Amino acid sequence: MDFLKNKNLIFRRTLSFNCSYLPKKMEKRLYINIPKSTDNQNLVSELTKNGFRRSFDHMYIPICDSCNMCIPSRINIKKFKLSKSNKRNLKINQDLIFKLDLGKTNNERYELFKEYCNTRHNDSQMAHMNKDEFESFFYNKFNKTNIYDVFDSSNSLIGSILMDIFIDGYSAIYSFFKPQFKKRGIGKYLIIRSILELKVQNIPYLYSIKY
């Protein structure tokens, strides 16, 4: 982390709080507020390479006392090959439409986000976001973002994934979907389709965190 040491950045630790992903676990984070600077993209890119993720206008990494289940990962897009389970997932969901959305956040996506959070993460801060906070989360001020949506055969939105764009790749920030589609592995489908899309674009890496 030599790059980070040279920036005179201020890192802070949170107190422990209930984990949104693993039941009966406590989470703690090391985080940094992103300063207003023309060098933000380089800073955010370096933080991402070191395992940090964005949330609103800060970057964080889990530093939990008794758990290390959240593992930062960097997927080499060029070397990525579909596994048997990946192929099964694509076959199960071959009726779905995956496409890039270039517009602003719409009401349909926000309502889907609320439905997902209320079902999966009802006790988390994200479950209580209003629409302005949601848009601030999706469209931050210090780097570009892309949103990919998934639609069913009736053209109803059933899932979305938010990805930040960095110098050497993309970072999967957050994904959500209709809870009733969980058995079809829509969360996994969003990642697989994102990887295949980035492969077409010759994007080097996809950063994410495995839970």
List the predicted regions and their residue ranges.
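Terminal substrate-recognition subdomain of acyl/acetyltransferases
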Residues: 1-104, 200, 204-211
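Metal-dependent nuclease catalytic cores in nucleic-acid-processing enzymes
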Residues: 188-204
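A conserved beta-strand-loop-helix scaffold within acyl/acetyltransferase catalytic domains
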Residues: 53-67, 73-183, 192, 197
